[in-house]
Amino acid sequence: MPAVDPVRLTADLVRCASVTPADEGALDILHDVLSDAGFDCAWADRGGIRNLFARWGRKGHPKTFGFNGHTDVVPIGNADDWSMPPFGAEVKDGIMYGRGTTDMKSGVAAFAAAAVDFVRDTPPDGAIVLAITGDEEGDATDGTTALLAYMAAQGEQMSACLVGEPTCPDRMGEMIKIGRRGSMTAWITFIGKQGHAAYPHRACNPLPALMRLMDRLASHKLDEGTEFFDPSTLAIVTVDTGNPATNVIPASCSGTVNIRFNDAHSGASLTEWIKTELSRIEGEFGVQIDLRIKISGESFLTPPGPLSALVSKAVKAQTGIEPVLSTTGGTSDARFVKDHCPVVEFGLVGQSMHQVDEHVKTDHIVELKAIYSRILTDYFA
């Protein structure tokens, strides 16, 4: 069996218009590549989402290296804004264009290619697992969590896991993610009493309460940062009255805030802080306030240790760059994997992800396969 070309495999995956929750054949392509190489493959579908589990080697082996990734992508927006077909995987001047070229079909292709070649040429004393989902860019309720549930039910496990998200800001090899901030969103509705703007004493205007609360939340310094995390941030993301009239005091208004928090906080502690602030505002302004909270993920950290050292060594050997260990950025499915085993993330340069004309250097895909190959070689040495 010839070596798997990660560039060709990336192109095959990109040509599948797998906008969440659609798969459009992407995971079937991966299934065939892995099963042909001797991987035991199974489907862990849930809620209409396709998820692929693949393992080479003995089930439950104490030395099992795992990889987690996704083949679903975000919408393309207006296709007319693209200079290349968004699902064409066309290459120009050494650059492949298309949705998912960076985030993260190239990462999935690079690891699959590395794993297939590795078990063919140097079968390890151990096992390799790939857990690939079609639900990362959406609600992520039936993706990696479904795969982990399937693994638990089947007695499958991973000793360590690498997530192939694009982690490098500008240069290939410059950053490994060893944790992520938590994320939560608060939707807050203020209910007053509608009235004529000329007679404010006959109404109860909820807007001053909204403005006061938003000012209190946004001006509060949550923390100074911790050893491995930057300071937590709070962003006001929506404010709405639904009131186009200039002579009417609105009956209600609403605002939304998003908090990205480090390990000085939890979703529960921040929820209590917001509730305390709401109580003060209710007492001061006499309005009714409704609160809805969604915690998308808690902060987590895989402390520097054997796994981050393993990946750092491979990255430096291939690129000559000593990668920074970071916890910056948004959420990823590593937030689910961290409850199963130690997890870090490493992948391509992510500058164009989710953008029009998303693209990747084909040389970087080849280099990423080489890095992943080094990781496997060193892990099973």
UniProtKB/Swiss-Prot annotation:
GO biological process: diaminopimelate biosynthetic process; L-arginine biosynthetic process; lysine biosynthetic process via diaminopimelate
Protein species of origin: Roseobacter denitrificans (strain ATCC 33942 / OCh 114)
Listed InterPro entries: ArgE/DapE_CS, Bact_exopeptidase_dim_dom, DapE_proteobac, Peptidase_M20, Peptidase_M20_dimer, Peptidase_M20A
UniProt protein name: Succinyl-diaminopimelate desuccinylase
Pfam families for the chain: M20_dimer, Peptidase_M20
Pathway(s): Amino-acid biosynthesis; L-lysine biosynthesis via DAP pathway; LL-2,6-diaminopimelate from (S)-tetrahydrodipicolinate (succinylase route): step 3/3
Keywords from the UniProt entry: Amino-acid biosynthesis, Cobalt, Diaminopimelate biosynthesis, Hydrolase, Lysine biosynthesis, Metal-binding, Zinc
HAMAP family: DapE (MF_01690)
Note accompanying the cofactor annotation: Binds 2 Zn(2+) or Co(2+) ions per subunit.
GO molecular function: acetylornithine deacetylase activity; cobalt ion binding; succinyl-diaminopimelate desuccinylase activity; zinc ion binding
Role summary: Catalyzes the hydrolysis of N-succinyl-L,L-diaminopimelic acid (SDAP), forming succinate and LL-2,6-diaminopimelate (DAP), an intermediate involved in the bacterial biosynthesis of lysine and meso-diaminopimelic acid, an essential component of bacterial cell walls.
Obligatory cofactor(s): Zn(2+); Co(2+)
Enzyme class: hydrolase
UniProt similarity note: Belongs to the peptidase M20A family. DapE subfamily.
Superkingdom classification of source: Bacteria
Residues annotated as binding Zn(2+) 2: 103, 137, 354
Annotated PROSITE patterns: ARGE_DAPE_CPG2_2
